């Protein structure tokens, strides 16, 4: 059934825009250039406002997810990477559940990727329609059908640009993937802004600077009681404070420390005697994939809940999914879940919130750990990184595990890989929860994504440097 399903949508995949694979080896400096161009296009789209919107001042239901989804309110990047990640989530789950089957041949993999792109474009249109019809840019009846259609077209074209930019990097023209690049850029930008923002905010305590570090110097310069000024700079509410910044740096250090955890399995050449090597199985075997898929799941739950609560606010089942409240303390207006599944699947605002509602905190912890472990185990089966796939790769390279025959390699790898995937997913979820409870800037999920992505780029750079021999050869 699976192959038949992919064959059915094959004609549609053939008409999709596609980036051709490079016909020659792309030099590192060219990859850096293409990566920079991709990032520049993304950042420009983040600043171009949507044409035709009447207002974007209403409470933002996705304020808490925008850092992770690389989206920017009221701009061409309104949807961010949400459509492409959501399509990936759906396709991976369908493949993992064996509803559709993906063969090992390059043709089947290409067809699967094409189907994922097709669903990404369909989801882009669907999300654009939902955003417009739920009144995020003004009352649709007042804007008129023409303006609504123009906004939907803009969001669709921007979503297509994101898909193609991601494909450009993944095909080998640049470094890493577009999704990772956009997420890391957005999160790092948020952290720097929250630390050094010169924007002033009127609070009950008077006018304060948004940036935590600038606020520290401002409070010390303007307050006569220096001890109280320091206390306020470290613990002020509803605005970034120094404790948030310290928590962010601490989480960065912890995640980098855990990146070094791995098990090295001894392997040897089946052809050349005396040629030994190791195959590393990292603690974060599936890297940041579990947290990206978990974020996609929650963001789509938010979209559905917001859409239904706008139309059927008094319905019992709708309220069971999520009830929302608007808040504008210390920043732009935003909608926050206060009940239902959406509330329990969202992180507590602070450690004090954990003590106030331990049931919420407990359910959130179980959800994060369980979903990350599940997505991690599912991912290895559909991404070509399961024990069977690794054994096949080693066999193709004419390598075998020391002390084991080729036939027993899969059994031996099965002792490590599924465990590393599940436990690594649990650790990813646990670190995200810890960062949320500590109040790290950009959310626990965001910090975790930023660190793992930056570390991936560091590994790419080290690998390229070892192949080229020197820094000068890399760039010149």
Swiss-Prot record:
Its transmembrane ranges are: 34-53, 77-96, 118-138, 145-165, 173-193, 241-261, 289-309, 355-375, 421-441, 446-462
Q: Which GO terms describe its biological process?
A: pronephric nephron development; protein targeting to ER; protein transport
InterPro entries xref list? SecY/SEC61-alpha, SecY_CS, SecY_dom_sf, Translocon_Sec61/SecY_plug_dom
Under the heading PROSITE patterns, the entry gives: SECY_1, SECY_2
Q: Which domain of life is it from?
A: Eukaryota
As for membrane topology, the entry says:
Multi-pass membrane protein
Coiled coil region boundaries: none
Q: Which Pfam families match?
A: Plug_translocon (PF10559), SecY (PF00344)
The chain's Cytoplasmic topological domains, given as residue ranges, are 2-33, 97-117, 166-172, 262-288, 376-420, 463-476
Say yes or no: keyword S-adenosyl-L-methionine present.
no
Q: Where in the cell is it found?
A: Endoplasmic reticulum membrane
- Which key words tag this protein in UniProt? Developmental protein, Endoplasmic reticulum, Membrane, Protein transport, Translocation, Transmembrane, Transmembrane helix, Transport
What family is this protein classified in?
Answer: Belongs to the SecY/SEC61-alpha family.
The protein's assembly and partners: The SEC61 channel-forming translocon complex consists of channel-forming core components SEC61A1, SEC61B and SEC61G and different auxiliary components such as SEC62 and SEC63. The SEC61 channel associates with the multi-pass translocon (MPT) complex.
Q: What does this protein do?
A: Component of SEC61 channel-forming translocon complex that mediates transport of signal peptide-containing precursor polypeptides across the endoplasmic reticulum (ER). Forms a ribosome receptor and a gated pore in the ER membrane, both functions required for cotranslational translocation of nascent polypeptides. May cooperate with auxiliary protein SEC62, SEC63 and HSPA5/BiP to enable post-translational transport of small presecretory proteins.
The protein here is known as Protein transport protein Sec61 subunit alpha
What organism is the protein native to? Gadus ogac (Greenland cod)
Which taxonomic lineage does the organism of this UniProt entry have? Eukaryota, Metazoa, Chordata, Craniata, Vertebrata
């Amino acid at each position: 059934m699976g192959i038949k399903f992919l064959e059915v949508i094959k004609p549609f995949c053939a008409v999709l825009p596609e980036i051709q694979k490079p016909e020659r080896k792309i030099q590192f400096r060219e990859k850096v250039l293409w990566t920079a161009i991709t990032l520049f296009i993304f950042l420009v789209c983040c600043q171009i406002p949507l044409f035709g919107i009447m207002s974007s001042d209403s409470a933002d239901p996705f304020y808490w997810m925008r850092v992770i989804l690389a989206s920017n309110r009221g701009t061409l990047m309104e949807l961010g990477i949400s459509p492409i990640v959501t399509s990936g989530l759906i396709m991976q789950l369908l493949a993992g559940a064996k509803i559709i089957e993906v063969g090992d041949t390059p043709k089947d993999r290409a067809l699967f990727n094409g189907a994922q792109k097709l669903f990404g474009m369909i989801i882009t249109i669907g999300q654009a329609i939902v955003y417009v019809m739920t009144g995020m840019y003004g009352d649709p009846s007042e804007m008129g059908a023409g303006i609504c259609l123009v906004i939907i077209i803009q969001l669709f074209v921007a979503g297509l640009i994101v898909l193609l930019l991601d494909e450009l990097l993944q095909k080998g023209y640049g470094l890493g993937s577009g999704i990772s690049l956009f997420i890391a850029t957005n999160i790092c930008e948020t952290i720097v802004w929250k630390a050094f923002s010169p924007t002033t905010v009127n609070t009950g305590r008077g006018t304060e600077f948004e940036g935590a570090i600038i606020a520290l110097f401002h409070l010390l310069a303007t307050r006569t009681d220096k001890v109280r000024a320091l206390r306020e700079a470290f613990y002020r509410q509803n605005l970034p404070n120094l404790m948030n910044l310290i928590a962010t740096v601490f989480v960065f250090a912890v995640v980098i420390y855990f990146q070094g955890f791995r098990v090295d399995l001894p392997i040897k050449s089946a052809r050349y005697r005396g040629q030994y090597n190791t195959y590393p199985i990292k603690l974060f075997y599936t890297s940041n994939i579990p947290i990206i898929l978990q974020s996609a799941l929650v963001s789509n739950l938010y979209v559905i809940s917001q859409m239904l609560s706008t139309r059927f606010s008094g319905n019992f089942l709708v309220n069971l999914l999520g009830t929302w409240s608007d808040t504008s303390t210390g920043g732009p207006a935003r909608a926050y879940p206060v009940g239902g599944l959406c509330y329990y699947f969202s992180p507590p605002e602070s450690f004090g919130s954990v003590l106030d509602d331990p049931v919420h905190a407990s359910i959130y912890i179980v959800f994060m750990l369980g979903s990350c472990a599940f997505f991690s185990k599912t991912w290895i089966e559909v991404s070509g990184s399961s024990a069977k796939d690794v054994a096949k790769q080693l066999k193709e390279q004419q390598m075998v595990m020391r002390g084991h025959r080729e036939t027993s390699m899969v059994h031996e790898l099965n002792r490590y890989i599924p465990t590393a995937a599940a436990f690594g997913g649990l650790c990813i979820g646990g670190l995200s929860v810890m960062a949320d409870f500590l109040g790290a800037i950009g959310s626990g999920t965001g910090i975790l994504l930023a660190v793992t992505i930056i570390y991936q780029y560091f590994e790419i750079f080290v690998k390229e440097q070892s192949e080229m021999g020197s820094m000068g050869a890399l760039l010149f």
